Curated annotation (Swiss-Prot):
Enzyme class: transferase
Keyword Transcription: yes
Domain remark from Swiss-Prot or TrEMBL: The N-terminal domain is essential for RNAP assembly and basal transcription, whereas the C-terminal domain is involved in interaction with transcriptional regulators and with upstream promoter elements.
Keyword ATP-binding set for record: no
Location of the region described as Alpha N-terminal domain (alpha-NTD) in the Swiss-Prot/TrEMBL record: 1-233
Protein family according to the UniProt entry: Belongs to the RNA polymerase alpha chain family.
CDD domains attached to this UniProt entry: RNAP_alpha_NTD (cd06928)
Protein name in UniProt: DNA-directed RNA polymerase subunit alpha
Main location: plastid
Description of how the protein assembles with itself and partners: In plastids the minimal PEP RNA polymerase catalytic core is composed of four subunits: alpha, beta, beta', and beta''. When a (nuclear-encoded) sigma factor is associated with the core the holoenzyme is formed, which can initiate transcription.
Record's function text: DNA-dependent RNA polymerase catalyzes the transcription of DNA into RNA using the four ribonucleoside triphosphates as substrates.
Provenance organism: Dioscorea elephantipes
GO biological process: DNA-templated transcription
Subcellular location: Plastid, Chloroplast
Length: 337
């Protein structure tokens, strides 16, 4: 556990981790401060950050399990102590860490008698099992247990659809929420008009990321939400209204992508953000540090200028070129004229 003394400050706004500890493989704790803030700012930031931490951070979960020998979810299998429903619940609790964005396959294939734990999950190399000791089932007889799994990265809570499985495939309620809890508190100091505040932020995570990583991702997500307001021009939007409702133009990435391919003038490039390009985190962070937030910013930069950026490599440029060609059928200019 790490603790640091907190000193009241009138210097430039800054943050610090004042306490950090690991209670278990699946419970990390961090306590942070941000100061000095003017009266009211701490509450504004604290409420926004808590919402972003609990609702905007992405996580990776097992979302489906399949075993052909299982007739239905509430059945039992000879030689297995747990019911199928209990096994599905245990799979739901497995904590994973990854940066994948598509559904990936994993599996369990073991023979009893033995305990089955998370260590027995055969997963893709870019998926890490945080706690390999997590319990799944107990095979009490010499039988084979083979389960096919689906792994997905998302955010929030996704309830499984209410359907009757016909092929032994069962969806799992997924909790894509690496942050278990987040609280904020405020300490005020000073007098009268000189009054200032210190924001205290506490974060508990499930071990798939540290509290500091969660704080970084939540901050980045909040910043991205406000990026459109930083553009000088206001885009004209036509609203179709009637007495009870109005219809907005399509805002999903897939709709934007489809329209862009049909007509490059259909969707302004400044409204397609680099978050949606699914770039590696290091490449993404380099672009963000250089104030490249949208596809328009990226195309305006040029290949040679990208290579000159700090920590940017030729492999990163190739990754961007491939992404632009694949999704948008456009090239990144080598040199700006």
């Amino acid at each position: 556990m790490v603790r640091e003394e907190i000193a009241e400050s009138t210097r430039t706004l800054q943050w610090k981790c004042v306490e950090s500890r690991v209670d278990s493989k699946r419970l990390y704790y961090g306590r942070f401060i941000l100061s000095p803030l003017m009266k009211g700012q701490a509450d504004t930031i604290g409420i926004s950050m808590r919402r972003a931490l609990l609702g905007e951070i992405e996580g990776t979960c097992i979302t489906r399990a399949k075993s052909e020998k299982v007739p239905h979810e509430y059945s039992t299998v000879v030689g297995i102590e747990e019911s199928v429903h209990e096994i599905l619940f245990n799979l739901k609790e497995i904590v994973l860490r990854s940066n994948l964005y598509e559904i990936r396959d994993a599996s369990i294939c073991v023979r009893g008698p033995r305990y089955v734990t998370a260590q027995d999950i055969i997963s893709p190399p870019y998926v890490e099992i945080v706690d390999t000791t997590q319990y799944i089932a107990n095979l009490t007889e010499p039988i084979d247990l083979c389960i096919e799994l689906e792994i997905k990265r998302d955010r929030g809570y996704r309830m499984k659809p209410i359907t009757n499985s016909q092929d032994g495939s069962y969806p799992i309620d997924a909790v894509f929420m690496p942050v278990r809890n987040a609280n904020h508190s405020i300490h005020s100091y000073g007098n009268g008009n000189e009054k200032q505040e210190i924001l205290f932020l506490e974060i508990w995570t499930n071990g798939s990321l540290t509290p500091k990583e969660a704080l970084y991702e939540a901050s980045r997500n909040l910043i991205d939400l406000f990026v459109p307001f930083l553009h000088a021009e206001e885009e004209d939007i036509n609203f179709e209204e009637n007495k009870n409702k109005f219809t907005l133009p399509p805002l999903t990435f897939q709709d934007r992508l489809s329209n862009l391919k049909k007509n490059k003038k259909g969707i302004p490039l400044k409204y397609i953000f680099i978050d949606q390009l699914e770039l590696p985190s290091r490449t993404y962070n380099c672009l963000k540090r250089s104030n490249i937030h949208t596809l328009l910013d990226l195309l305006s930069k040029g290949q040679e200028n990208l290579i000159k950026m700090e920590y940017f490599h030729i492999e990163d440029v190739k990754q961007i070129l491939d992404t632009l060609q694949k999704h948008f059928a456009v090239d990144l200019p080598k040199v700006l004229i």
